[in-house]
Amino acid sequence: MENTQMGMKARIDVKHPWLAILPLMIGSFVGMFSETSLNIALPQLMKALQVGQSSFQWLFTGFMLVIGIILPLSSLFTKWFTTKKLVLFGLAAFIIGSRISGFGINFSMVLMGRMIQGIGTGIIFPLMFTIAMLIFPPNKLGTVNGVLALVIMFAPAIGPTLTGLILAVGSWRDIFFTFV
């Protein structure tokens, strides 16, 4: 009986677990939103940065490449740093990368900002699921993981639409400032 009750408790007792995981959900949403949002701004960005499509593709490839490198390392990072420090670093990296890209005066600067965004996104994604497993009881994890997956899948679905609205009233720079 005691074993069953232990299985129904979260490993870390948090009074409001949904409130605790909300910043990570927002960070993951924005990370995925940023993945698809630049597609709509392609013509404006290519013209403003004076680059061709093959060079411009690096804004997507660089972002995804960095995420692909950081994701497997995130487990190692949790052994070296506290979860709080990793969350703060991940969110800060994404914000700093967004600002660098938004203020970018040339293609290299925008690309560097995108890659820094990738660092933040690569840290936040796995942390969101790890923290959920710690602060929610096991019997709630199915629901929690479903909601987290919904957040991640919803962002790229609405990314192009929101970007179109942003571009209708602003410039490509505003896309990056929206992430902040």
Give, region by region, the residue ranges found by the protein language model.
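Cytosolic juxtamembrane N-terminal segment immediately preceding the first transmembrane helix
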Residues: M1-F33, K47
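Membrane-interfacial loop-to-transmembrane-helix junctions in polytopic alpha-helical membrane proteins
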Residues: I12, H16, G52, M109-M112, ...
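Extracellular/periplasmic helix-loop-helix junction of adjacent transmembrane segments
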Residues: A41-I70, F107-M112
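Recurrent gating helices in multi-pass secondary carriers
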Residues: A20, S28-N39, I67, P156
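Signature tryptophan residues that serve as conserved aromatic anchors
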Residues: W18, W58, W172-D174
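Helix-loop-helix hairpins in multi-pass membrane proteins, especially solute transporters
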Residues: L71, S75-V180
